[in-house]
Amino acid sequence: KKMANGFHDIQSLFCLVDLSDKIYIKKIYNKKTDEISFRGPFSKMVKKNENSIKKILRIMRQKNMIFNYYSIKVIKNIPVFSGFGGGTSNAATILKHLINKKIKKKTIEEFTNKIGSDLRLFFISKGF
């Protein structure tokens, strides 16, 4: 069943795995646009025009959480659309890095509704 927020009403079990993309972030000083690039074995499958990184940056600017622009390079080691949460974990990593402080639960929930329901998983401080 699809809910009002566009997500499906499901229950999921999560298992954290030792698999990760590599993300390089640099502040851009003379441009008013982000430069996002993808490399690696799974880079060709990433939607360049609309992806979790573009979404998280756009939302952060709408909420006045960031004011700079960034060059972001992602080495895609996590298969795209595989269910491993690669895009969502990248968004969470960028959010944590750029904010560089504890993020309120309410803020995480707001981002979860726009990025993906598994986003909150990447803010859990303890393993299972």
Regions found by a protein language model. Give the residues of each.
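Short, flexible active-site-adjacent loop segments at beta-strand->alpha-helix junctions, enriched
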Residues: 78, 88, 127
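ATP-binding N-lobe of GHMP and related small-molecule kinases
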Residues: 1-82, 100-102
